[in-house]
A protein has these predicted regions:
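The feature captures the beta-strand-to-loop junction immediately N-terminal to the Walker
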Residues: 32-34
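H-loop/switch region of ABC-family ATPase nucleotide-binding domains
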Residues: 194-195
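ABC ATPase nucleotide-binding domains
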Residues: 233-252
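Conserved ABC ATPase "signature" region
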Residues: 96, 111-129
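Conserved ABC transporter NBD signature motif
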Residues: 55-63, 72
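Catalytic Walker B motif of ABC-type/P-loop ATPase nucleotide-binding domains
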Residues: 158-161
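Helix-to-loop junction immediately C-terminal to a conserved catalytic motif
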Residues: 47
Length: 252
């Protein structure tokens, strides 16, 4: 994903201004920043679900405006923060929706498609839920099914908007470890927003940090040394120590 002088916002408000940089294949990149600074707006713009004020986004070297919806579905999979409840559809069938770009005009699944669906379910630890319906599952379980759908789509780019939001602590680390493995072993570009700074610092190759209206994209080690993370904490009550990579609350 490459950004060229990209400006995003809504109405007259600019959230991200004149962004130039890239999110690379083979890496897990976290998008961090305060609430309301444009994390979801940026992800939605990459997925052609939001407007661009100016500049451009390139996917695999091609301007996003020149990419058809059909082609985009083979390039980008997007997992949103929306709570999905599909009452009458089995989890296996929900994950199979990720194969839609590759099936024939009547949507018939081939043996390879079925194998990919089963592998996606196994990757997120949800094989035992394959025949259950999502209306009988927790938020975290539903989120994992939607991530499995994205994996089944087999795109080079995967976008996730706060994928760990409904997961407990062990599952947060397990999920991000899985995403890192996919990025490294399958050369995928995986870009996800998160408020889990500790996970981002430990597991991500690069960090994209929004400091309105700028967005800085750096390898994790460089981001730690850059001072950008410290500037997130502007109240004086909370501080970030780049040596220990920890956030602490100052005593009164």
């Amino acid at each position: 994903i490459r950004f060229n002088n990209l400006t995003l916002g809504y109405g007259t408000r600019t959230l991200i201004d004149s962004l130039t940089g890239e999110v690379r294949c083979g890496e897990l990149t976290a998008l961090v920043g305060r609430n309301g600074t444009g994390k979801s707006t940026l992800l939605r713009a990459i997925a052609q679900l939001g407007e661009i004020h100016s500049g451009d986004i390139f996917l695999n070297g091609k301007p996003i405006g020149d990419i058809s919806p059909a082609e985009l579905s083979t390039l980008v999979a997007f997992v949103t923060t929306d709570k999905v409840r599909i009452a009458n559809l089995r989890c296996r069938d929900v994950v199979a929706l990720g194969r839609a770009p590759y099936t024939n005009w009547i949507g018939r699944m081939q043996q390879l498609d079925n194998e990919i669906v089963e592998q996606a379910l196994a990757s997120v630890g949800m094989s035992d839920y394959a025949d259950k319906t999502m209306d009988r599952m927790s938020d975290g379980e539903c989120q994992r099914i939607m991530i499995a759908r994205a994996l089944a789509q087999q795109t080079p780019i995967i976008l996730l908007d706060e994928p760990t939001a409904f997961l407990d602590m062990p599952n947060r680390y397990e999920l991000c470890t899985l995403l890192r493995k996919l990025a490294h072993e399958e050369n995928k570009c995986i870009f996800f927003s998160t408020h889990e700074l500790d996970i981002a610092l430990e597991l991500c190759d690069s960090i994209a940090l929004i400091s309105p209206p700028q967005l800085h994209i750096l390898p994790t080690e460089e981001m730690v040394r850059s001072g950008h993370i410290e500037r997130l904490f502007t109240t004086g009550i909370v501080s970030f120590d780049p040596e220990t990579r920890t956030v602490s609350i100052k005593e009164k």
